[in-house]
Amino acid sequence: MNIFIKQNSSTVKRRYPLQKFVLKFLWLEKNLAVTVDQVTNRGNSPITEYFFWPRKDAWEELKDALANKPWISYDESIALLNQTTDVINYWQEDEKKPSLSEAQAKFPNCIFTDKFANCLYEN
């Protein structure tokens, strides 16, 4: 399964082997949004809406959304929530936010974009 992310007129190909779920983040100056996609052999399928931090408690909303998906195991939910915590902490650790490319380098198993329309999927 390939994921293509369009950024600044270039396309970056990434592979997420053996992952059942992938976290996607909308990386903005004043907000961070997170959603979860299920990785299938046909591409990704969104399973949650975007949850925004710090506008709302994105972590708590994501926890509730995952709890309502009985086909996501407790361990998978914990792993997704722990990764979300790490990204939120990284995003808010300094007054000057890390760049999108720094976030991508630090969390290579997540998808990041700074513009909602830039996230494209192809098989």
Swiss-Prot record:
GO molecular function, one term: structural constituent of ribosome
Listed Pfam families: PSRP-3_Ycf65
Highest taxon in the source lineage: Eukaryota
Gene Ontology annotations of biological process type: translation
Keywords of the record: Chloroplast, Plastid, Ribonucleoprotein, Ribosomal protein
Keyword Chloroplast annotated: yes
Gene Ontology CC terms, in alphabetical order: chloroplast; ribonucleoprotein complex; ribosome
Primary location group: plastid
Location within or outside the cell: Plastid, Chloroplast
Subunit: Part of the 30S ribosomal subunit.
Family statement drawn from the similarity comment of this UniProt entry: Belongs to the chloroplast-specific ribosomal protein cS23 family.
Functional summary from the UniProt entry: Probably a ribosomal protein or a ribosome-associated protein.
Name the UniProt record assigns to this protein: Small ribosomal subunit protein cS23
Annotated organism of origin: Mesostigma viride
